[in-house]
């Protein structure tokens, strides 16, 4: 049973993912999938809740097996139950518990990339309302936690306007 709100869970989730990436000597981590996203989940007894999921991607390192061991050791230090699926040469690390519900580190996530992803524990809340709240903040120009480094996606429903740019004043 969690005592965190979904947004507190998001804060812990983002810190967990970013702290995990810091265990590796890899640069270029970014939220390829977008910001932290809320989802519906079950709290038991038919009660619905909400939790966030979040991931970061980076170019693959040169020592996937060593990097998998580093992530596993770090997650164990956080009190997580950890298992390494040793699909040589691209192991995957799975963790449960600790600061998040579950997490995974994939050394072959796609085009020569690493991926660290996690899901926060389910907490009382409404995922749709949270998403609307997050999107309202984004529309107001507020950077929602986890959005740092995301690339805006083209929205065919949105009307884009090109603003005329005033010519620069000549230097002198």
For the regions a protein language model found, what residue spans apply to each?
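Short small/polar-residue motifs
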Residues: 39, 76-81, 97-104
